[in-house]
Amino acid sequence: MTPMKIILAAPRGFCAGVNMAIDSLDLTLQKFGPPVYVYHEIVHNQFVVKTFREKGAVFVDTIDEVPEGGVLLFSAHGVSPEIRKAAQARKLHALDATCPLVTKVHLEAIKYAKAGYTIILIGHEGHDEVLGTMGEAPEAIVLVEDEADVDRLEFEPGTQLAYLTQTTLSVDDAGRVIRRLRERFPEIHSPPKDDICYATQNRQEAVKLLREDADVIVVLGSQNSSNSQRLKELAAEQGKRAMLVDGPQDLAVDQFSDDDRVLITAGASAPESVVQSTIDWLKENFDASVDTQVVREEDVQFPLPKPLRAFAAEQAAAK
């Protein structure tokens, strides 16, 4: 019998936006001390959120939960102008860890709205990123999730249309919705550059290319992570066994066979530590070997929020 083989996908795990957001929260806690309030989860990963709670971060869903004058960090998913104004009204010391690729979508929404366009936003209702983007121009944005939503759209003749997308969508799903939009509204404007982020695309590409050789696919990530859910869906497309788990604590020995070929990847908000602990669990239980498959190299970094850059430099110099 051939022993278990782990196919370790690369790239996987943290993207540049998540790295920046996590570094920002770490530095904010060091600079100001706890408690540091974070509007929504810093990233959609339960392990990361638990770790920061233990360090003194407090995750809130409304600005009213933050004491006046408190320190507040906006998460990687971005916020609406209304939230920024509410933070100012409470005299909060607000820092912004919004991913620059999300900010790009916000700026596109503002630009199109000012030019008189109706914006069709492709995304998941209720997702933090979607709420922030829609808040930039609520009177001008219509949300769609799939082709059926597109088929229900009706606009006055002569309406100028543009579309934008949530950054963490399935490339294939978004492509189908965009094709339907173009069929129904041939004059619709598209963003100058694809809104789906590089890391989302790269991780999906790796799963597509590597799933053929796998019997089972394990995606490390949390259930509320949009990009992790899309990876699981992609993994399961051809009838393969696919699971989305936070770590080895969610796995059972009877889910695997001794000779399985197990593809492991991780969503953009899942830390490498949970990948390694999952590999260790499979090695311990199945004597598995690891074969890393690099599909694409990544070397992207995003700058910290300006108020943290000098402090970060001081901390680095002191080491």
Swiss-Prot record:
UniProt-annotated binding residues for isopentenyl diphosphate: H44, H77, H127, S225, S226, N227, S269
Q: Which organism is it from?
A: Rhodopirellula baltica (strain DSM 10527 / NCIMB 13988 / SH1)
Write one Pfam family the protein is assigned to. LYTB
Gene Ontology terms describing biological process: dimethylallyl diphosphate biosynthetic process; isopentenyl diphosphate biosynthetic process, methylerythritol 4-phosphate pathway; terpenoid biosynthetic process
Organismal lineage: Bacteria, Pseudomonadati, Planctomycetota, Planctomycetia, Pirellulales
Keyword tags? 4Fe-4S, Iron, Iron-sulfur, Isoprene biosynthesis, Metal-binding, Oxidoreductase
What gene is behind this protein? Answer: ispH
Q: In which pathway does it act?
A: Isoprenoid biosynthesis; dimethylallyl diphosphate biosynthesis; dimethylallyl diphosphate from (2E)-4-hydroxy-3-methylbutenyl diphosphate: step 1/1; Isoprenoid biosynthesis; isopentenyl diphosphate biosynthesis via DXP pathway; isopentenyl diphosphate from 1-deoxy-D-xylulose 5-phosphate: step 6/6
- NCBIfam families from the UniProt entry: ispH_lytB (TIGR00216), PRK01045.1-4 (NF002190)
Q: How is the cofactor bound?
A: Binds 1 [4Fe-4S] cluster per subunit.
The residues the record assigns to binding [4Fe-4S] cluster are: C15, C99, C197
The record's top EC class is: oxidoreductase
- Name assigned to this protein: 4-hydroxy-3-methylbut-2-enyl diphosphate reductase
Q: What is the documented function of this protein?
A: Catalyzes the conversion of 1-hydroxy-2-methyl-2-(E)-butenyl 4-diphosphate (HMBPP) into a mixture of isopentenyl diphosphate (IPP) and dimethylallyl diphosphate (DMAPP). Acts in the terminal step of the DOXP/MEP pathway for isoprenoid precursor biosynthesis.
